[in-house]
Amino acid sequence: MFPMVTEFMNYGQQTVRAARYIGQGFMITLSHANRLPVTIQYPYEKLITSERFRGRIHFEFDKCIACEVCVRVCPIDLPVVDWQLETDIRKKRLVNYSIDFGICIFCGNCVEYCPTNCLSMTEEYELSTYDRHELNYNQIALGRLPMSIIDDYTIRTILNLPERKT
């Protein structure tokens, strides 16, 4: 008779434990009901990037001294710097500068170590194209500043991000 009583008690304890686990899961589900949605309607709503966001690289041709520091600090030797030596003034003259964003890992080393600050990171992150070769930007394409998300009247910016509890 005692084994039947202990089995019945174990069954009761397991039932209470299962009900408690179901209740805890239900409370977690209900706590998420009042939160803001994490997803956004992408083409029409965009998040404002942080101050230190590493987006597309902006290049200022006039500031570059063709020192090739950006090539040396790049982990994949990505920037292509073509220059000619001006013999009369004994200085390098920059001819061409290009970066292939299909290969770039956006580490930011080139921007950080540039002695003349001719490289900077922008907030542009939309680099999708149908042709891979369009991701190879020369000095003209790198020199264009992207339109700021805040200034674009057709896009609603999301300022208040839902806070995450860690």
From Swiss-Prot:
Subunit structure of this chain's protein: NDH is composed of at least 16 different subunits, 5 of which are encoded in the nucleus.
Chain sites annotated for binding [4Fe-4S] cluster 2: 74, 104, 107, 110
Entry binding sites for [4Fe-4S] cluster 1: 64, 67, 70, 114
4Fe-4S ferredoxin-type domain sequence ranges: 55-84, 95-124
Catalytic reaction list: a plastoquinone + NADH + (n+1) H(+)(in) = a plastoquinol + NAD(+) + n H(+)(out); a plastoquinone + NADPH + (n+1) H(+)(in) = a plastoquinol + NADP(+) + n H(+)(out)
Entry GO MF terms: 4 iron, 4 sulfur cluster binding; iron ion binding; NADH dehydrogenase (ubiquinone) activity; quinone binding
Family from the record: Belongs to the complex I 23 kDa subunit family.
Biological role: NDH shuttles electrons from NAD(P)H:plastoquinone, via FMN and iron-sulfur (Fe-S) centers, to quinones in the photosynthetic chain and possibly in a chloroplast respiratory chain. The immediate electron acceptor for the enzyme in this species is believed to be plastoquinone. Couples the redox reaction to proton translocation, and thus conserves the redox energy in a proton gradient.
Compartments where located: Plastid, Chloroplast thylakoid membrane
Main location: plastid
Source organism per UniProt: Coreopsis petrophiloides
E.C. code: 7.1.1.-
Pfam families hit by this protein: Fer4_10
Name of the protein this chain belongs to: NAD(P)H-quinone oxidoreductase subunit I, chloroplastic
Keyword field: 4Fe-4S, Chloroplast, Iron, Iron-sulfur, Membrane, Metal-binding, NAD, NADP, Plastid, Plastoquinone, Quinone, Repeat, Thylakoid, Translocase
GO cellular component labels: chloroplast thylakoid membrane
Membrane topology according to the record: Peripheral membrane protein
